[in-house]
C-alpha cells in the first residue's frame, strides 16, 4: 500500500498578515519558512504538511502580505515532492463553509494539494476546518494518522484559557488513530493520541515564556520529533529586580519584553535602563510598567482562586456561542492588543 509520506515535515498557524500586516511579522514568517525547508532537507523529508491558518485575516489579504505568501508557498513547493495545505478557519472567507479561501492560487502549483475536503491516502487522512455536521463523521475514520485543524474541548486555547465543551467534536471521536495531529490552538499540548503540535513561533504576549513552537518531523511508523526555531521571536514578562541580576539571560535581539518596576527607582533611572538595554541587546521592543500597589491588605482564608483580567476576558470570549460571531477572531484581536 502506498502511504502519504515516508517522512513528513509539519507546521501550522503561521498567520501571515498579523499585526495589521506588519512587515516585521511577515519577514519573521518568511525566515521561518526558509528555516523549515532547510531543516526538513537535513532530515530527508519528502512531504510537507501545513495544518491551517496561513493568513490571519479571513476577509481581506493585503497586497504586501500576498507577495510574502506567494514567495513562501513557492519556496516550500520547490523543496518537497508534495506539499499538503490544510485550510484553517482563518483561511476561509466564511467560517461555516469552505466555498471561498484566501489561497486559490495553490491550484496552479502541480505539487501543492489544497485539502478542501477530507483526503485519505493509504493509512493517513487530512481534514480541513470542519463545517456543519461534518464533525459527526470523524469517528468513522480508520486511518492510522490524522492531520487537521480541530477545535477540541478541554485543550488550552493559550496558556491561561481552556476550550469549553459545547457538545460537538471531542478527542473521543478519534478512537481508531495512533496519532491525531492538529493546528488551531497555538500551545503545544498532548492528551491521549491527540497532539496539538504548537504553532510556528510565538506571536504576542499571550505566548510569553512559551518557546516550544516550530516544526514537527514525523517518520512513518515512528514518533513525532519537535524542533524549535532558534531565531523565533520571544515574549517575556519579568520583574525588574529579577532581570537586573542577569539581563543577558533574558534578552537578545529577538526579544519583546515587559518589565514590571518592582524597585523604587526614578523616572530618569528607568529610562536610562531602558535605553541601555535597548542599545546593548537590540531588542524588538521594551516596555517598563509601574508595579501595581495594593491600597489595603487583607487576610484571606479558605480556598481562593485568583484570575487575572486576561484570564477573565479570554474565558468569557471562549464561552461565546454564536453562528455569526467567530470567538477565535475575538480572542486573536484581544491578544493583539497586548503587543
Give each language-model segment a name:
Residues 2-9, 119-126, 141-145, 194, ...:
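Beta-strand-turn-beta hairpins that frame and shape the catalytic cleft
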Residues 4-5, 14, 18-119, 173-177:
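Core catalytic region of metal-dependent phosphoesterases/phosphodiesterases
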Residues 13, 33, 48, 53, ...:
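Divalent metal-coordination and catalytic microenvironments
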Residues 15-19, 56-59, 86-97, 132-134, ...:
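Active-site environment of divalent metal-dependent phosphoester hydrolases
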Residues 69, 87, 91-172, 200:
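Conserved catalytic scaffold of divalent metal-dependent phosphoesterases
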Residues 76-79, 139-142, 171-176, 250-252:
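Short, conserved loop/helix-junction motifs that constitute active-site signature segments
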Residues 159-223:
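Conserved beta-sheet core of the metallophosphoesterase superfamily
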Residues 220-339:
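Accessory, non-catalytic peripheral segments of nucleic-acid enzymes
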Amino acid at each position: 500500500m502506498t502511504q502519504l509520506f515516508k517522512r513528513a515535515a509539519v507546521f501550522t498557524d503561521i498567520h501571515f498578515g498579523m499585526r495589521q500586516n506588519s512587515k516585521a511579522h511577515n519577514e519573521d514568517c518568511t525566515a521561518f519558512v526558509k528555516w523549515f525547508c532547510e531543516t526538513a532537507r537535513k532530515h530527508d523529508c519528502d512531504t510537507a504538511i501545513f495544518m491551517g491558518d496561513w493568513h490571519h485575516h479571513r476577509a481581506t489579504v493585503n497586497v504586501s502580505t500576498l507577495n510574502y505568501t506567494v514567495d513562501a508557498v513557492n519556496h516550500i513547493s520547490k523543496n518537497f515532492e508534495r506539499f499538503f495545505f490544510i485550510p484553517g478557519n482563518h483561511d476561509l472567507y466564511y467560517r461555516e463553509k469552505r466555498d471561498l479561501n484566501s489561497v486559490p492560487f495553490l491550484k496552479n502549483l502541480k505539487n501543492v494539494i489544497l485539502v478542501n475536503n477530507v483526503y485519505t491516502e493509504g493509512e493517513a487522512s487530512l481534514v480541513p476546518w470542519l463545517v456543519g455536521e461534518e464533525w459527526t463523521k470523524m469517528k468513522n475514520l480508520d486511518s492510522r494518522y490524522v492531520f487537521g485543524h480541530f477545535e477540541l474541548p478541554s485543550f488550552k486555547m493559550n496558556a491561561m484559557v481552556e476550550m469549553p465543551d459545547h457538545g460537538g467534536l471531542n478527542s473521543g471521536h478519534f478512537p481508531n488513530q495512533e496519532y491525531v495531529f492538529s493546528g488551531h490552538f497555538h500551545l503545544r499540548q498532548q492528551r491521549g493520541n491527540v497532539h496539538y503540535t504548537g504553532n510556528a513561533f510565538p506571536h504576542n504576549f499571550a505566548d510569553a515564556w512559551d518557546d516550544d513552537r516550530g516544526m514537527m518531523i514525523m517518520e512513518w511508523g515512528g514518533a513525532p520529533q519537535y524542533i524549535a526555531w532558534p531565531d523565533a521571536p520571544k515574549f517575556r514578562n519579568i520583574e525588574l529586580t529579577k532581570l537586573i541580576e542577569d539581563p543577558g539571560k533574558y534578552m537578545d535581539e529577538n526579544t519583546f519584553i515587559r518589565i514590571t518596576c518592582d524597585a523604587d527607582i526614578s523616572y530618569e533611572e528607568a529610562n536610562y535602563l531602558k535605553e541601555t538595554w535597548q542599545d546593548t541587546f537590540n531588542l524588538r521592543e521594551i516596555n517598563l510598567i509601574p508595579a501595581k500597589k495594593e491600597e489595603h491588605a487583607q487576610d484571606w482564608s479558605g480556598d481562593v482562586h485568583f484570575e487575572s483580567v486576561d484570564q477573565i476576558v479570554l474565558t468569557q470570549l471562549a464561552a461565546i456561542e454564536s453562528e455569526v460571531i467567530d470567538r477565535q477572531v475575538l480572542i486573536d484581536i484581544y491578544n493583539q492588543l497586548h503587543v
